Amino acid sequence: MERSRWRRQLSTRWDERRLEAYLRYADAIKRFTSVAGRLAAGKGLFDLPQPLAQDVGLERLADAELERGYAFEAVLLMGDAETISAARALQRHAWVLEQFVRDMRSGTAQDWTQAFRQFQEKRDEYYIAARKSLGVHAAFRLRAEDPVILGQDPRQL
């Protein structure tokens, strides 16, 4: 009896740690791509109200990349295979955005938008994998299927 209770408690603790790792990575990748988006706005590739100048932005991007890397290590340690693969795909698509703002990849605003949408799709896939790993059964709607996103943007009315 004691042994089964101990195992349940241990499983609960690992689930909590896994949740923390997944959330930390999601937050770190969001910070990274937010800085990249603001840098892209400063280059005229993206329409955001708070563009960042290259000198300040690249330093912030480097800091965000360090944090993203640290957070990824926790996903590697605590995550299941599917979530780890989804996190790797997500980071690769985030790096594409970084290449645009570091002038390592040329392109137009349309190219940036396409790369950003691909990143968003990979982010959705990461969330789906993380939710499955954590046993979250509530429905999750992909951006590509969400009627709110597919409808007209009220900012453009």
What is each residue range found by the language model?
Residues 1-157:
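Conserved non-transmembrane functional hotspots
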